[in-house]
């Protein structure tokens, strides 16, 4: 199993890139190969997922570990294969995608190739509340102008702002903040997971 490859990007096509490492050229399928165009001819690090079938071994490449994590989560959904999962995250912006899953916005999800209404509902059913790790690492936090997070620990404040960025209302968050505040010494990820559990009860 490969974790990443570091080498020279030698070729970019509409479907894949080629990274040369140790005098071997590795063909790596990516969601948007042209996002690597600025790296052509230079050394790059690409995070990998190896997909093995009876008749084929493929390498899928990602620019961040968060993209790869989300890709693997999508693969766990019934009806989603590697090509479909890659197409879903091809935009490179995972926050709106996670927000759609958490808010059960199946209309947003059906805009992706090969994702119909049934598959969109399956994605929501399987992944809602399970993507806190990606949320915490991808969202840029901005200090709020209200007092909703005043007096909270840095970890809880970060979690609340992440949930707010995902579209949860102030009213929803204020309902769960007192319960979250009772839990001390949790990480931001743990607070997010707990909040999602409380809000989906």
UniProtKB/Swiss-Prot annotation:
Q: Which organism is this entry from?
A: Listeria monocytogenes serotype 4a (strain HCC23)
Q: What is this protein called?
A: Holliday junction branch migration complex subunit RuvA
Q: Domain of life, per the record?
A: Bacteria
User: Keywords, A to Z?
Assistant: Cytoplasm, DNA damage, DNA recombination, DNA repair, DNA-binding
Per UniProt, subunit arrangement is:
Homotetramer. Forms an RuvA(8)-RuvB(12)-Holliday junction (HJ) complex. HJ DNA is sandwiched between 2 RuvA tetramers; dsDNA enters through RuvA and exits via RuvB. An RuvB hexamer assembles on each DNA strand where it exits the tetramer. Each RuvB hexamer is contacted by two RuvA subunits (via domain III) on 2 adjacent RuvB subunits; this complex drives branch migration. In the full resolvosome a probable DNA-RuvA(4)-RuvB(12)-RuvC(2) complex forms which resolves the HJ.
Q: Where is this region: Flexible linker?
A: 143-153
Stretches for region Domain II: 64-142
List the CDD domains: UBA_RuvA_C
Q: Which gene encodes it?
A: ruvA
